Amino acid sequence: MGLPKSFVSMSLLFFSTLLILSLAFNAKNLTQRTNDEVKAMYESWLIKYGKSYNSLGEWERRFEIFKETLRFIDEHNADTNRSYKVGLNQFADLTDEEFRSTYLGFTSGSNKTKVSNRYEPRVGQVLPSYVDWRSAGAVVDIKSQGECGGCWAFSAIATVEGINKIVTGVLISLSEQELIDCGRTQNTRGCNGGYITDGFQFIINNGGINTEENYPYTAQDGECNLDLQNEKYVTIDTYENVPYNNEWALQTAVTYQPVSVALDAAGDAFKHYSSGIFTGPCGTAIDHAVTIVGYGTEGGIDYWIVKNSWDTTWGEEGYMRILRNVGGAGTCGIATMPSYPVKYNNQNHPKPYSSLINPPAFSMSKDGPVGVDDGQRYSA
């Protein structure tokens, strides 16, 4: 026997009312903030980030941008179905063009090395279900590129710092400024953007790289200090590219070392990301270089652990978790152009993450990984 029409109508009315109340509650920040309250928030934000505007009309112009950013944040976070949050950070009163031209410095183009088969998927290959090179001591603290499009240098240096630690056991913070000042090429122009692989090639050609302490970061282009360039503390042997658009190969590579990648970071959601697993929206027009330092799964959602160079005020203390295993180019194009430095030890290649955390379960040869560990198995 069916339910009475009056009962069905009352039920629909009840649930519709609940939905309206829920939306109203979630949108309360949008409707209850007065202009004076938002102004007070902006003044506090200006103090926090050390900003001030003195030219006529500039404060008012920036305040309008801030208000729109706050509206975007409130609308995004009101949706409880989203897997990540956004928030106010140092970019809150920048226009999209200012943000892109200042902070996105990856120059896309053809890579100059052939793709290596070192991390090609192998039938039956099993990878750890979780990797975090931070816990293995192979990741230097978050750095800030400042108002310089030198993300390519930060990504290259982060992977060199990582492989050096994995091979030698010593973690040394290295000099991005040396790459920016001394590593210029036709396509790599310091704070005006560049190739990650040009950074690797400079270190190889130079016979090494200096430390951050000796050649400190200035967030601007400078003349190459030849005396400091000749102080070489860390070397690499070569660099290679992970097979393109292949997240399993990328996962294999990250099992053995941090990996440089580029992605599309131009959208508002990426710019204001604060926590959770980022799922977009974003495209695949890669414009920003970062470093993958691990991967994992939370609540059934696979993710990459990404180290950025926008200070600890962005994201999860400077890091982002971004959706993994979506196929093709990956979320925001993260699997489009991965690359990594190679530094040989007596066994020709570093040990994987699992052997540094637990008893060794892999062995390495110059041709690639051999062996298995607990985790995810690849099948063709």
UniProtKB/Swiss-Prot annotation:
Family assignment from sequence similarity: Belongs to the peptidase C1 family.
Single GO MF annotation: cysteine-type endopeptidase activity
Origin superkingdom: Eukaryota
Reactions the enzyme catalyzes: Specificity close to that of papain
GO BP annotations listed: proteolysis
Catalytic residues (positions): C151, H288, N308
Purpose: Cysteine protease responsible for the cleavage of kiwellin into kissper and KiTH.
Protein name per the record: Actinidain
